[in-house]
Regions:
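Ser/Thr-rich, Proline-interspersed low-complexity disordered segments
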Residues: 1-21
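Low-complexity, acidic Ser/Thr/Pro/Gly-rich terminal tails and inter-domain linkers that flank the onset
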Residues: 24-51, 151-182
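A eukaryote-biased signal for short, well-structured alpha-helical docking elements
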Residues: 16-32, 123-164, 267
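Hydrophobic beta-strand positions in extracellular immunoglobulin-like domains
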Residues: 61, 75-76, 103, 192, ...
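Asparagine-centered strand-capping/turn motif at beta-strand->loop junctions
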Residues: 60-66, 191-197
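Short, solvent-exposed loop/turn segments enriched in Ser/Thr/Gly
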Residues: 51-58, 182-189
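Short, solvent-exposed, Trp/other aromatic-anchored flexible loops in extracytoplasmic proteins
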Residues: 54, 81-136, 212-262
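Short, hydrophobic/aromatic beta-strand segments
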Residues: 67-74, 198-206
Length: 276
């Protein structure tokens, strides 16, 4: 389970959610300590929320070793939904970097998230020259708006036209809608739930459109107990090459596997047909 980090403060944090102004530091005078050991120290120095651009987490990473290290976030979720901020920093031996993790307002709103009440992530620190050597791999949960584990809620999705393709004790996979208005591509918007205590990988195999094999090269990882929204795109050039002017059916084999154990059996391996 994720660790709740330590806080260092000169002013008491509020118990109630912070209502963001155009831009403000949600931590006030608080510094969140994620890790502090002989090798590394990582602190969240402040969290700024801008109503137009999104949330920015200012992070300080200190490398106390004599070799270059790579700091990164993995398996990131915001309010229960997977979100990849694409953050990583390489820090030379004995040096410190001040960096920023950005959470985009538009991307979060597409998932139904209007307030970033909870963020869970795995902090990885590895040797830059030897990626097999891990100095740190630990999960953390922070609550930027002052809520806690008992008060924040996962935003629920309302998609009346959605087609539920798979729903069992382990996974849920839903095609919410498809957009064929843009002649340059055909995009399917999908939603997934991981109901297990393992990290899972969702992918499509043996995909055909109107009976013609076209591979969208799609795969998404979903952390244990989390949800995800994603887009699956077929490009106009591929459709045109197969003489497809309008998509009438998409057939695919949905594969759900253990993200951390590639030799494990599939949790799901089933073929479905979607009719837009």
């Amino acid at each position: 389970s994720a660790t709740t980090p330590t806080t260092e403060m000169t002013g008491a944090p509020t118990d109630a959610p912070t209502q963001p102004t155009e831009s403000q530091n949600l931590l006030d005078d608080t510094i969140i300590e994620l890790v502090n050991n002989d090798d590394v120290a990582v602190h969240i120095m402040n969290i700024e929320n801008n109503e137009h651009t999104g949330m920015q987490l200012r992070i300080q990473c200190e490398n106390r070793t004599d070799r270059a290290l790579m700091f990164s976030w993995d398996m990131v979720s915001v309010c229960g939904y997977m979100y990849d901020p694409m953050w990583a920093e390489e820090v030379a031996g004995g040096k410190t970097v001040n960096s920023t993790v950005y959470l985009d307002t538009y991307a979060l709103e597409q998932m139904g998230i209007t307030s970033v009440d909870e963020i869970t992530f795995t902090l990885n620190v590895i040797d830059s020259e030897n990626w097999m050597e891990t100095l740190l791999k630990e999960s953390f949960t922070i609550y930027p708006t002052g809520l806690d584990a008992s008060t924040w809620q996962v935003p629920q999705r309302e998609t009346p036209d959605a087609q539920v393709m798979a729903d069992d004790e382990n996974v849920r996979f839903v095609i919410e809608w498809a957009d064929g208005e843009d002649t340059s591509k055909f995009t399917m918007y999908v939603y997934m739930e991981n109901k297990t205590d393992r990290n899972l990988m969702y992918s499509w195999d043996m995909v055909s459109v109107n009976g013609y094999m076209i591979d969208p090269f799609w795969a998404v990882s979903v952390a244990a107990g989390k949800r995800a929204c994603s887009e699956i795109t077929f490009y106009g050039s591929d459709l045109e090459a197969n003489g497809i002017e309008e998509v009438s059916d998409v057939e695919f084999t949905l594969l759900v596997s253990d993200y951390d154990d590639w030799e494990a059996d599939y949790l799901l391996e089933e073929t479905y047909t979607y009719n837009p």
